[in-house]
């Protein structure tokens, strides 16, 4: 809410809720950095709903810096869950998308996917036209403009009644700040992170946070042995959804750093998740990014076996957050113009989402 503070969008999902003393919000606040992370995405978020969220803030993304966590776990065979998408989707996102769409491959794919995941969406006739590559009539455009204005007014009205919520700050950030040294030093922070993690991962063999293990895994861990043996992330509509996000970043000339997190390697071994398949997925994601000019990538996908790198089965914590900070802080603290992105609409196709060959041979 501070107008003078530079807020930087950090796009992701449930990793932002994995608080410990090395969490990006804690470090930014404790060491009074020149920016504050603005976390976007909750549990169950993925690229498709991030894309629609971006429609509401396209002017704020223009020429700015962003951080984007892209989790290989999103890339399941069936893709994004319709109920999760509908839970986060709202009418303001819809009118923002409809009023800003350019009738291009991105607009068409977004409309097709929207009808798949939300068949009863408002203004479905307009969405249907876009999905077929047709132009909207001037009547439809006026109607969308009117609805967008109404949504903005409603938003402004209700935001007057929203209490300034400092609960997250008081409960999740302040308590951790007290444990950190006043002078910033990665060496000192690593010692604190390791000591804290050691204490909090004592009740299981996976190096998972005690509380998470007790509440989420302890009662069913025996049943989960080998359950991911056949899991694959190589074929998924999520690759096409990711392309929407890349297209938006290119249009907004946003300079982005992408974070690829690992899986807890002990958990990976226990559940039978193939490390080779995971790396093939990462290679496919990286090719989609790098071949279009998105070359700022912090790839932690092979670090799931490092001590106290992971807080649970798939989320970073402690030393993982410090590795994240070493990559992200210099990038965000020293903003640079976006590179000249070369968007390739072939990444919207089913051929790409189902492709399992060498990524660089995809034509």
Give, region by region, the residue ranges found by the protein language model.
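Short extracytoplasmic
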Residues: 1-16
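Loop/turn elements at helix/coil->beta-strand transitions in domains of secreted/extracellular proteins
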Residues: 5-7, 35-36, 62-65, 251-256, ...
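Short loop/turn segments at strand-loop or loop-helix junctions that form parts
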Residues: 12-13, 68-73, 213-220, 259-264, ...
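Secreted/periplasmic serine-hydrolase-like ester/acetyl group-modifying domain
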Residues: 14, 97-243, 345-363
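Membrane-embedded segments
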Residues: 16-107
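Extended hydrophobic/aromatic segments used for targeting, binding, or gating
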Residues: 29, 234-308
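C-terminal regions of proteins
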Residues: 39-42, 276-277, 283-363
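Extended, charge-rich low-complexity interaction segments
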Residues: 63-85, 102-112, 127-135, 320-342
């Amino acid at each position: 809410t501070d107008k003078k503070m530079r807020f930087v969008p950090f796009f992701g999902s449930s990793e932002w809720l994995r608080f410990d003393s090395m969490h990006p919000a804690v470090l930014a606040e404790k060491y009074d950095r020149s920016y504050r992370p603005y976390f976007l995405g909750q549990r169950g978020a993925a690229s498709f709903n991030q894309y629609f969220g971006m429609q509401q803030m396209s002017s704020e993304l223009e020429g700015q810096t962003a951080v984007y966590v892209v989790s290989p776990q999103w890339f399941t065979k069936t893709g994004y869950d319709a109920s999760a998408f509908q839970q986060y989707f709202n009418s303001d996102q819809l009118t923002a998308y409809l009023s800003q769409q350019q009738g291009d491959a991105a607009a068409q794919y977004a409309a097709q996917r929207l009808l798949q995941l939300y068949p009863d969406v408002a203004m479905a006739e307009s969405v249907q036209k876009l999905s077929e590559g047709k132009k909207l009539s001037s009547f439809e455009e006026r109607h969308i403009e009117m609805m967008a204005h109404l949504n903005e007014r409603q938003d402004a009205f209700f935001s007057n009644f929203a209490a300034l919520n400092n609960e997250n700050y008081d409960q999740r950030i302040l308590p951790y700040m007290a444990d950190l040294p006043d002078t910033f030093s990665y060496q000192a922070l690593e010692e604190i992170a390791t000591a804290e993690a050691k204490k909090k991962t004592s009740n299981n063999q996976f190096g998972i946070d005690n509380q998470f293990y007790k509440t989420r895994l302890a009662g069913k861990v025996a049943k989960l042995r080998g359950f991911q043996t056949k899991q694959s992330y190589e074929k998924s509509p999520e690759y096409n959804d990711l392309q929407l996000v890349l297209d938006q970043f290119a249009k907004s000339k946003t300079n982005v750093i992408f974070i690829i997190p690992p899986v807890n390697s002990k958990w990976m071994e226990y559940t039978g998740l193939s490390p080779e398949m995971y790396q093939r997925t990462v290679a496919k994601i990286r090719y989609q990014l790098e071949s279009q000019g998105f070359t700022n990538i912090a790839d932690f996908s092979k670090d799931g076996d490092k001590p106290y790198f992971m807080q649970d089965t798939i989320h970073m914590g402690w030393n993982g957050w410090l590795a994240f900070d070493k990559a992200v802080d210099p990038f965000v603290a020293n903003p640079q113009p976006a590179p000249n992105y070369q968007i390739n609409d072939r990444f919207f196709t089913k051929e790409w989402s189902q492709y399992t060959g060498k990524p660089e041979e995809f034509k």
